Amino acid sequence: MRDTFPLLLKTDFPAVYRDRTDTLQANLGYRCNQSCTHCHVAASPQRTEAMDRETMELLLRYLAARRIETLDLTGGAPELNPHFRELVSRARAQGVRVMDRCNLTILNEPGQEDLAAFLADQAVEITASLPCYLEENVDQQRGKGVFESSLAGLRQLNALGYGQPDSSLTL
């Protein structure tokens, strides 16, 4: 990779300052239950790359050592990583705020029937993605039936308190 810092020193580019890192985004893998045409990481059900246990342990140690406040989980569908629930539970036990970038349809997948309840029990913040409010557009981008499955996922989360007034669960 080309080092561009020396080039910046020769310009009037303003100095860049930063404070301590308080949010860490971690990609847990490229496996996903969808195959979206617009996916920037080309995630799909055929992808197998995933964060392993050793890396997860390093991540948890880093969170503690650097006093990271927020862990932002992404993928693919981060929930399909075999260590997802353990990572969430252990990060929450450290007092770390956890965000899950959820495609909503994962909540309806076989083997994930209790996922919404797990997320609520752990007070995980959900960043839900739905690329459009029109069924035809969503299904064209993400696959047939994704719009309705996404709404079903939202209903599950709403029933648990996500997005409801006076609830501490963030959607």
Question: Which residue ranges define each predicted feature?
Answer:
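Conserved alpha-helical substructure of the radical SAM core
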Residues: 2-75, 79-97
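Radical SAM/AdoMet-radical enzyme domain recognition
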Residues: 53-72, 81-171
